[in-house]
A protein has these predicted regions:
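Non-catalytic regulatory/gating segments with a bias toward low-complexity or hydrophobic composition
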Residues: 68, 127-128, 147-149
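Short acidic/polar hinge/loop motifs at secondary-structure boundaries
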Residues: 104-132
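Flexible loop and strand-edge segments within Gram-negative outer membrane beta-barrel domains
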Residues: 201, 230-236, 246, 250-299, ...
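Transmembrane beta-barrel wall of Gram-negative outer-membrane proteins
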Residues: 169-196, 208-263, 286-288
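Extracytoplasmic beta-strand/coil segments of soluble accessory domains associated
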Residues: 65-108
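N-terminal periplasmic "start-of-domain" segments of outer-membrane beta-barrel proteins
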Residues: 30-61, 86, 94-97, 127
Length: 333
């Protein structure tokens, strides 16, 4: 009886294993499948590159410049975090690159460029590149191309919250808060990003040579000093509010507002021998962007209208002692 039970138990364990081997080894031959689609008339001849949303959400400390450098072929010229970062397509300058946010151009009106270090990747839901003349369908003046940025309505009902924090070296802190609400008619999204850092790293200054003298004042040696980065701290605050409302008749109204408050120190020249902490070189920026829109899709016909507003207060400050006698003078624009 015991021998019979043992044999039955072994057969019971062996049958599933054999079935599993057969199922994994089984192959099914199917006929070829053709997948076809129609390209809209306005997309014919358009060279477009879509940026993966995973790249935009990869790192809280990343700006849009980092995301473009990682996920696209566009050339990004950057001097480090919280410093000027520009984008240019092949064979063109940064001023030839147009940038739109929800359909509104955000290029600097003075130089025509856009500082991508002031655009957090967490604030962008959709990003695409239109190369060369492909940008004429969206905006004009883009000899090199267009960087198209946008936000999308909240999908799903209910209230959701997301909080991400990052901590780095040299007293660097990043905090991101995202609050969303979705209902039958209304949807809302609130994003807040706050970044701050002392950015006082140590480096060997090869542009400043120190000499070692003996008791008689004769030079007996020399070395390159180890110094800290002065005046390189930054503080960035971003707040974005979005509201969407859909009527029963199919009309959708939207409002998106983005406020930026930035204070950035411009690092001193490595050849500057003035070590006084009173010397300052800073750039402050306060920018407000707002876009209101209306869309209607009915009977295969899409109508829409948008209105945008932008305001920028950019101030540069230089506090120095031009005579070298300790009398510091403030120069500002």
């Amino acid at each position: 009886m015991l021998r019979t039970a043992t044999i039955l138990l072994c057969l019971t364990c062996a049958l599933p294993a054999a079935a599993q081997r057969d199922s994994t080894a089984r192959t099914i031959a199917i006929e070829s499948v053709d997948i076809s689609g129609r390209r809209p008339m306005k997309e014919i001849g358009v060279q477009r590159t879509e940026l993966d949303t995973l790249v935009l959400r990869e790192n809280i400390t990343a700006s849009l410049a980092d995301a473009l450098a990682t996920g696209s072929t566009i050339f990004i010229k950057s001097y480090g975090r919280a410093t000027l970062a520009t984008a240019s397509f092949r064979g063109t300058a940064p001023s030839h690159t147009q940038v739109t946010w929800n359909g509104m151009r955000i290029n600097n009106p003075m130089l025509g460029m856009t500082d991508f270090s002031t655009i957090p990747s967490y604030f962008i839901d959709q990003a695409s590149l239109l190369h060369g003349t492909s940008s004429v369908n969206e905006t004009g003046g883009g000899l090199g191309g267009l960087v198209k940025l946008g936000t999308t309505p909240q999908v799903g009902e209910g209230f959701h919250a997301q909080y991400v924090q990052g901590i780095g070296s040299f007293a660097t802190f990043d905090e991101f808060l995202h609050l969303t609400y979705g209902g039958a008619r209304w949807s809302s999204s609130t994003r807040v990003l706050y970044s701050t850092s002392d950015n006082d790293f140590r480096f060997r200054n090869y542009n400043s040579k120190e000499f070692v003298t003996d008791d008689n004042g004769q030079i007996v040696g020399e070395y390159y000093p180890l110094q800290r980065n002065r005046n390189g701290g930054f503080r960035d605050l971003h707040v974005m509010q979005e509201l969407y409302y859909t009527t029963r008749g199919g009309d959708r109204f939207s409002l998106a507002a983005w406020y930026l408050d930035s204070h950035r120190g411009l690092a001193m020249l490595t050849s500057d021998r003035n070590k006084s902490k009173q010397k300052k070189n800073t750039q402050d920026e306060r920018t407000l962007r707002a876009v209101a829109g209306w869309e209607r899709l009915r009977h295969g016909l899409k109508l829409g209208a948008r209105a945008g507003y932008t305001y920028t207060d950019l101030r540069y400050l230089l506090k120095q002692a031009p005579e070298g006698k300790g009398r510091f003078v403030v120069n500002t624009d």
